[in-house]
Amino acid sequence: MRLGPRTAALGLLLLCAAAAGAGKAEELHYPLGERRSDYDREALLGVQEDVDEYVKLGHEEQQKRLQAIIKKIDLDSDGFLTESELSSWIQMSFKHYAMQEAKQQFVEYDKNSDDTVTWDEYNIQMYDRVIDFDENTALDDAEEESFRKLHLKDKKRFEKANQDSGPGLSLEEFIAFEHPEEVDYMTEFVIQEALEEHDKNGDGFVSLEEFLGDYRWDPTANEDPEWILVEKDRFVNDYDKDNDGRLDPQELLPWVVPNNQGIAQEEALHLIDEMDLNGDKKLSEEEILENPDLFLTSEATDYGRQLHDDYFYHDEL
């Protein structure tokens, strides 16, 4: 990206914001396929340093902690892990680590350690300076204008998360800002935000054309690009529940704020498919211990990370 002197500084901010957004997107839409085993490992153990720590555990301690986790996943204590039990556990794990990460971020953003994060503190942490855009004045430069819109959107979300209208966000409000999908009072705001961005004709719905954004069909092409076919399939089969060719506010929600349920269910089914030796569509402790590495390279143990977090392997959860 080439920027003139006037836009260089803000261009760097835009790159930072884009990188941050990409990180969030990757959390929600982790690629499958060739990286399947890596995805499994991170789901159970976490990042590479957690995997390394797991390896350092003695075999007996590894098995002891793994058995403790298996016992907790088995909600009805029947000795088997079903798809539902695995999915519920993985979703709980996602939420636990998201909350832990938000708590760590809160400390970093709270520059004066007063247990609140102000908008200025958020800006300083994100961009090393306080940024203030005029909401009603568009910028001529396309990149500057793109960043202005992104920044104003974050500001509105920050203000919505601030329930008590105090000088900044408490920890709970900061979690609502970072993870609106986990907080009920943010739902309506997120939907309205999506409508403002995508509902071009103002009818209160998002059509397929609006869903696809700026894509224009190429009359010289024999068929649509593969990514368009995928997006159309998602629109029809995943989001448009009443099959009326448009997304109403409630149908918008799983698109704009996807939760982890689908990811967790897919991972649970993957584990059962790979580890179920007798074809009963569930996993016994024996089947898991027959191939523990696969289980420890999956979301079920956050890629083994849970073996180092006593929140998961201690008796009281």
Curated annotation (Swiss-Prot):
SUPFAM superfamilies: EF-hand. Residues 61-96, 97-132, 150-185, 186-221, 227-262, 263-298 form the EF-hand domain. Ca(2+) 5 binds at residues 240, 242, 244, 246, 251. The modification Phosphothreonine is found at residue 137. A motif (Prevents secretion from ER) lies at residues 314-317. One of its GO terms (molecular function) is calcium ion binding. It is found in: Endoplasmic reticulum lumen. InterPro entries: EF-hand-dom_pair, EF_Hand_1_Ca_BS, EF_hand_dom. Ubiquitous. Ca(2+) 3 binds at residues 164, 173. The keyword Coiled coil does not apply. Ca(2+) 2 binds at residues 110, 112, 114, 116, 121. Ca(2+) 6 binds at residues 276, 278, 280, 282, 287. Ca(2+) 1 binds at residues 74, 76, 78, 85. Ca(2+) 4 binds at residues 199, 201, 203, 210. Keywords: Calcium, Endoplasmic reticulum, Metal-binding, Phosphoprotein, Repeat, Signal. Residues 1-22 form the signal peptide. Its main location: endoplasmic reticulum. GO terms for cellular component: endoplasmic reticulum; endoplasmic reticulum lumen; nucleolus. Not known. Binds calcium. Belongs to the CREC family. This is Reticulocalbin-2.
